[in-house]
């Protein structure tokens, strides 16, 4: 069984963790923040009736 080369292990370890952190930060920043005063869409539906509102 070949010996593990420590330098390549450190390089791969740091590259993988840097990639994971970049992907997580991109995913978290891709969603717009929801402010309390604004609704996420300008479309409002009347939910007091049982009829479907086709858009």
From Swiss-Prot:
The lineage of its organism: Eukaryota, Metazoa, Echinodermata, Eleutherozoa, Echinozoa. GO terms for biological process: proton motive force-driven ATP synthesis. This is ATP synthase protein 8. Residues 34-55 are annotated as: Disordered. Residues 39-55 have a biased composition (Low complexity). The keyword Ion transport applies. Keywords: ATP synthesis, CF(0), Hydrogen ion transport, Ion transport, Membrane, Mitochondrion, Transmembrane, Transmembrane helix, Transport. F-type ATPases have 2 components, CF(1) - the catalytic core - and CF(0) - the membrane proton channel. GO terms for molecular function: proton transmembrane transporter activity. Belongs to the ATPase protein 8 family. It is found in: Mitochondrion membrane. It is a single-pass membrane protein.
């Amino acid at each position: 069984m070949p010996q593990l080369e420590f330098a390549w292990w450190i390089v791969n370890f740091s590259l993988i963790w840097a990639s994971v952190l970049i992907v997580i930060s991109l995913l978290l920043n891709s969603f717009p923040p929801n402010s309390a005063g604004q609704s996420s869409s300008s479309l409002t539906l009347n939910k007091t009736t049982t009829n479907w509102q086709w858009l």
